[in-house]
């Protein structure tokens, strides 16, 4: 039986697809359950929504690290300008890479399955930080039941491989297959500016399919005579079309390319505000995505300001200096905005 979903439900589902904060996602799921038409054609979807509400509620109610009964968090609340998940097979060097990029003290060892729980860390880039979350290795020999749930808050993924290991060819396909079975697709498509990364395209039919834009990170090239040639051969044999870099977590080779590349392809826009007659506050920018608007900036400052906003003046690439613009004016990275209510 066709689902015959209503416009109200579709709007709620679209908002859920874009949500990254776990509590926002939980509220979105509850709204989806409230607005979904109740008939046999939606029975399966209703059951899926109820199951996810239960799982996410239990995770959010679970005492966290340091609590009397709790353990490490399985879902990491996003921080910084974006959340990037580190994914890969055993012994690919994810934890060493994470430690190099973030300065974290996450355990790293030359044996598999060192990482047992999500390990967050912050990678600085210019005047912002990107949150990198090291996840347990993906392998059929060591299933991680909560892995797909942990990925729901991510904006993108780093798929880490050991370029020196001939087994990487089969391991990467196993990683992709396991994730697909859990309705997570590592895609080579990075959305155009203004579109949220990590969101299933509307029209997929399944609101719970997650498509994570992915950068392939070919690690351990310190052991190769020509890492770039090996990477080209690896991509040709596997048929993968991911954007890719060669790096060495051991020596630091190539690591400086990752932050700038992620920043440019995530479409991040740093926006600064100013009061009339005063210089802009450049200490801490508001973080948006290119294509978001002046109204979105006002909402980040205060929800009441978003409602009362009359116009703004803007300095930057999205307009000439001091130009008066309306609430729907799109912002660009580096814009300075003066909000008037």
What are these regions (language model features)?
Residues 17-82, 87, 92, 98, ...:
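C-terminal-of-GTPase-core extension/linker across diverse P-loop GTPases
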Residues 10-17, 64-82, 102, 113-120, ...:
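Switch II of P-loop NTPase G domains
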Residues 106, 140, 168, 225-226, ...:
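Conserved protein kinase catalytic core
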Residues 1-4, 30:
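Short, charge-rich amphipathic alpha-helices with coiled-coil/heptad character
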Residues 91-107, 116:
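A conserved segment at the C-terminal end of the G1
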Residues 177-186, 263:
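Acidic, Ser/Thr-rich peripheral helices and adjacent loops at domain boundaries
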Residues 109-110, 144-147, 324-327:
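Short beta-alpha junctions and helix-cap segments that line functional grooves
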């Amino acid at each position: 039986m066709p689902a015959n979903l209503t416009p109200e439900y579709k709007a709620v589902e679209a908002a859920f697809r874009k949500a990254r904060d776990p509590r926002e996602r939980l509220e979105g799921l509850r709204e989806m359950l409230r607005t979904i038409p109740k008939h046999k054609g939606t029975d399966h979807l209703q059951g899926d929504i109820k199951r996810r509400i239960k799982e996410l509620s239990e995770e959010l109610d679970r005492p966290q690290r340091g609590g009397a009964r709790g353990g490490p968090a399985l879902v990491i609340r996003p921080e910084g300008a974006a959340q990037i998940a580190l994914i890969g097979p055993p012994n690919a060097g994810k934890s060493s890479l994470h430690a190099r990029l973030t300065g974290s003290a996450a355990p790293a060892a030359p044996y598999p399955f060192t990482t047992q729980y999500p390990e967050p860390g912050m990678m600085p880039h210019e005047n912002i930080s990107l949150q990198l979350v090291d996840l347990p290795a993906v392998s059929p020999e060591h299933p991680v039941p909560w892995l797909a749930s942990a990925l729901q808050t991510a904006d993108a993924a780093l798929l880490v491989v050991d370029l020196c290991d001939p087994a990487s060819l089969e391991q990467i396909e196993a990683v992709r297959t396991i994730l697909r079975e859990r309705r997570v697709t590592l895609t080579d498509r990075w959305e155009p500016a203004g579109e949220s990364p990590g969101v299933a395209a509307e029209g997929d039919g399944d609101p719970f399919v997650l498509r994570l834009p992915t950068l392939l990170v070919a690690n351990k090239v310190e052991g190769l005579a020509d890492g770039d040639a090996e990477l080209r051969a690896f991509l040709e044999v596997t048929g993968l079309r991911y954007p890719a870099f060669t790096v060495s977590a051991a020596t630091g080779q190539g690591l400086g390319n990752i932050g700038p590349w992620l920043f440019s392809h995530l479409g991040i826009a740093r926006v600064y505000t100013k009061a009339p007659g005063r210089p802009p506050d450049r200490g801490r920018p508001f973080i948006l995505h290119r294509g978001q608007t002046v109204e979105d900036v006002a909402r980040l400052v205060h929800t009441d300001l978003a409602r009362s906003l009359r116009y703004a003046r803007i300095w930057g690439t999205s307009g000439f200096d001091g130009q008066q613009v309306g609430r729907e004016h799109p912002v660009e990275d580096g814009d300075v905005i003066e909000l008037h209510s």
